[in-house]
Amino acid sequence: ISSGGSLQGILESHDGAMWIDVPAGQPPRSAVGHIFGTQINLCWSLGLLPRMEEKELDGMLARMEKLRDRLDLVGGDGSMMGIARELHGQRLQIMSAPALEAMGYRCRTQLNENSGILATASILPELHHNEIVAWGEGDMQDNVQILLFVWNGMHDRVGLRVEWTLDTLQNIPIHILDCAGDS
């Protein structure tokens, strides 16, 4: 999967290789919709994943469009810009439920790369097993803000840990990012 260039040339010169085109001119991080959509459609077409029912797919796309419009930095409701302003110049800790670990990790890497700040990430309950001790040490709570990824499908025990975390770290600004969807 590429937008052409050298990779396309290499693949076209080999029998059995397949090249799948996506629009050119975008860095991978801004082309994620094209890339992911192409990958999922390929998996459906090859029978590697069961195809979503049309109603389910329409619901997912409608949710994504609504969120895109609400969270847009220019025309949205301002919530993302508000969080960005609060996070500016702060140390960032990303916490996530186990099912959202990859999302927390990706958020950390994007913040590190694109904002030039050092963000760290942890998952619940591992956070409470090892890391929670450090939160009580010295100045660990100074100039730090937390991004907490949760969703309605979390295990009940993880939900209890989230509540405990909110109570224990109540002096630290925590931004709860409630992820939408059923999967």
Task: Locate the predicted segments by residue.
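Conserved beta-strand segments of alpha/beta enzyme cores
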Residues: 18, 118-120, 173-175
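Active-site phosphate/pyrophosphate-binding segments
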Residues: 44-143
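C-terminal active-site/capping subdomain that shapes the small-molecule cofactor and substrate pocket
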Residues: 133-183
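Short, structured patches in soluble enzyme cores that scaffold and shape functional sites
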Residues: 24, 38, 96-98, 150
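A short acidic, often aromatic-flanked loop/helix-cap motif at beta-alpha or helix-coil junctions
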Residues: 26-30, 127-129, 181-183
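Short glycine/serine/threonine-rich phosphate/pyrophosphate-binding segments
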Residues: 1, 7-9, 101-105, 129, ...
